[in-house]
Amino acid sequence: MNRICIVGRITRDPYNNITNSGISYSRFTIAVDRRNFSSQRSENITDYIPVVAWRGLSEFIKKNVFKGTLVSVEGSLQSYIRSEDKNTSYEVNIENFSILESRQIIEERKSKIQGNHSMNSSFLENNINYNALKEYKNHNTNNIQNQNSYSNEKSQSQTSFLDDEQTSESNEKWDLESDWD
C-alpha cells in the first residue's frame, strides 16, 4: 500500500498552472520536522517534501493556501524521471488535504508578510477538510465548462471547531467561495 501522511508548513506560495489538456494543478513544498535519533541530543531535522494537487483541489489551494500555512496532507508517493538531468524525483500526489489553522491566523500572517501588523487575539481553530477523491469524482475533468462553474458548486469540505483541547461536536458544510474570499 502506497500511503503518505504528513503535517507541516508550506515553504512558499504554491505554484499554480494548467496542463496543455486544461487540467489545473498546484505544486508546493511542505517543511516537516523529524527527530534525529542518531546524534547524542534529540535534534529536529527538517525535511522538505514536494507535493502536487490536481483539478478542484488545486483551485481550492490557489485561493486559500499561502506561505507558512499549517497543513495536513494524505496521498501517495510517486516517482518520475526529470528530463533535464535524468534523475529520479519523488513527490506526494495529494488525495486528502486539511488546513490546520484558522482563517484569522492565515490572514494575520499574510498581513505581516505584506508589512502590515495586525493585533493578535484569541481564536477558534478551524480544521478545513477537503477530500480530493470526492472532488475528483464529482467533476468531469475533461470539460473546461465544469471547471469554470466550480465556484457555483457546494464544497464537500467539513469544518470542526476546536477550543483549546475540547472538540465541538458540530460539523458544518462550507461554501469555499463565500467563506474564504
UniProtKB/Swiss-Prot annotation:
The keyword Transferase does not apply. GO terms for biological process: DNA replication. Gene3D superfamilies: Nucleic acid-binding proteins. GO terms for cellular component: nucleoid. Keywords: DNA-binding. Residues 142-152 have a biased composition (Low complexity). Disulfide bonds: none annotated. Residues 170-181 have a biased composition (Basic and acidic residues). The keyword Nucleus does not apply. One of its GO terms (molecular function) is single-stranded DNA binding. Residues 142-181 are annotated as: Disordered. Residues 1-101 form the SSB domain. It comes from the Bacteria. Homotetramer. This is Single-stranded DNA-binding protein. It comes from Mycoplasmopsis pulmonis (strain UAB CTIP). The gene is ssb.
